[in-house]
Amino acid sequence: MNRFQAGLIQSAFYLGYFLLALPAALVMRKFGYKTGLVIGLLLFGTGALLFWPAAVVQRYGFFLFALFVIAGSLSFLETGANPFISVLGDPRTSEQRLNLAQAFNPLGCIAGVVVGTIFIFSGIELNPAQVAELKTGGKYQAYLQHETLRVITPYDVLGCIVFLFAVVIMSTKFPKIAEESESAGDAPQGSFRELFKYPHFVQGVLAQFFYIGAQVGTWSYFITYVQDYTHLPEKIAGYFLTGTLVVFTIGRFLATYLMKFIAPSKLMGIYSLVNVILVAIGVLLPGWIGLWAVFLTSFFMSLMFPTIFALGLKGLGPNTKIGGSLIVMAVIGGAIFTPIMGRIFEATHSMATAMIVPLVCYLFIAYYAFIGSKARLPQPALAISR
């Protein structure tokens, strides 16, 4: 697989997220959060099961389509679950609820890495001489097919588990949400035009765009940074990357606790400024000091996605579902900032210099946390007495 084909994996994933966020919001605006979540789970299960025929026919495009379906399902789930958790309860603690729920996301990532390592990756790494020998003997295609077929069982099991979750959600009675009760009547169900009257929401979409760019960019090039400046082998660098997921998880659970004592926006602002300092160290002091500095940014970025989401949705009322979809669409930042970092790396031959991109992203997030996130609700027009 060449670099262009590898890049299509990221494209398929982010396009799935981006393109299905608005349809997800429209479905949920008409039928409610529960329907949207069930559709998301059914799409996920379908996407997982599509890996079976994709592996059998050995077509790269088929794998991309399956991945696109899974990404689209995640768009449904994010567009539904995040706003639902945000409005389910006291608005003053929406950031805590969302951080707690999102804390299980990296746990799933870690579990996925473990499952992939055990059940998908065979651990067999062929050197060029061995590959040439297999090709000469006409056995290389059989070897590739055998390796590819290893994805079938894990993805089939995953698909079945997700379908089971869909059944559980279908049979679960959801609590009544105020905005859905209003939507069921004659009250307006929200519109895109209305959303632009909320500056904290518009800036929240931008903040999420910058955050995803910083997160994906940092993690995408972390192994390159480690290898360039410490000369560790790729496998050991991979362990460091897994470690970032661990500290990311710890950070979310700890942030949920700290929000009992510190305002979420203030805490995010402090964390953002800490990351500005840490990334600056990574830029100016590449090496072991820079490595640990960039490593620790995962801890301090952990609260940003759910906190930005909750802050951006505050006070949107019937516009919450559509607003949530636009914040989900901001994940496209990962597909934009990562190539920018790559171009900087190619131009300067310095991964440390490319880290300036996430540094700038954290500066904007700090601004949003301290200033832009203050909810300013649109004021109704005053009647003029005559």
Predicted feature descriptions by range:
Residues 262-308:
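C-terminal transmembrane helical hairpin of 12-TM major facilitator-type secondary transporters
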Residues 8-29, 242-254, 333:
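Central cavity-lining transmembrane alpha-helices of secondary-active solute carriers
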Residues 59-77, 289-304:
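Hydrophobic core of transmembrane alpha-helices in multi-pass small-molecule transporters
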Residues 42-57, 273-287:
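C-terminal ends and interior cores of transmembrane alpha-helices
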Residues 96-125, 325-338:
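Glycine-rich segments within core transmembrane alpha-helices of 12-TM secondary carriers
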Residues 76-90, 302-317:
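Intracellular juxtamembrane helix-capping segments at the cytosolic ends
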